[in-house]
Amino acid sequence: TLREALETTKIHSVAGKLKEVGLMNQRPFRSPHHTISNVALVGGGSYPQPGEISMAHNGVLFLDELPEFKRDVLEVMRQPLEDREVTISRAKFTVTYPSSFMLVASMNPSPSGFFNDPSAPQTSSPHEMQRYLSKISGPLLDRIDIHIEVTPVPFEKLSDDRKAESSVDIRQRV
């Protein structure tokens, strides 16, 4: 909507990240590296700037390899996920930025990345897997609505010579 485009544009303008386009008409997609700091994620500084969660407002915040993020960095997202805004307080003033974003996260169920892969050796012990997964707190997991396990598909199954259905056939079916 126009209201969402204006909100998103304002946030990017305040952060000094507004491209030469006057109005942002595409939803933001933000994908910070797992080494990000608390301040870079939620915002801050002596004059509080928006962080990644506000830069993702009205869009998607994608966290790849979720357990690789520091636990305290993940925990600072809990309240903004709940409230859809983040408040940054400093000695002289307080700033509130919107942070209504869709959180999408990916992760392997083990540090080796090969759990449930029949073609790879299992290199992580159950204890290592538990320690790896425990980096993500229950309260944060509660704020993630959909959990999907994707099992490995052998390359041969993806690349075999089966004939694909034509667009004409699909159109007739629909």
Task: Please give the residue ranges for each predicted region.
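Inter-lobe coupling/hinge segments of SF2-like helicase ATPases
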Residues: 3, 21-23, 73
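Short gly/ser/thr-rich secondary-structure transition/capping motifs
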Residues: 42-47, 84-89, 127-131
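Phosphate-sensing "switch" segment of ASCE/P-loop ATPases
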Residues: 95-100, 110-174
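Inter-Walker segment of RecA-like/P-loop motor cores
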Residues: 20-43, 47
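AAA+/SF3 P-loop NTPase mechanochemical coupling elements
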Residues: 26-30, 48-49, 53-58, 88-109, ...
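Walker A/P-loop
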Residues: 1-19, 83
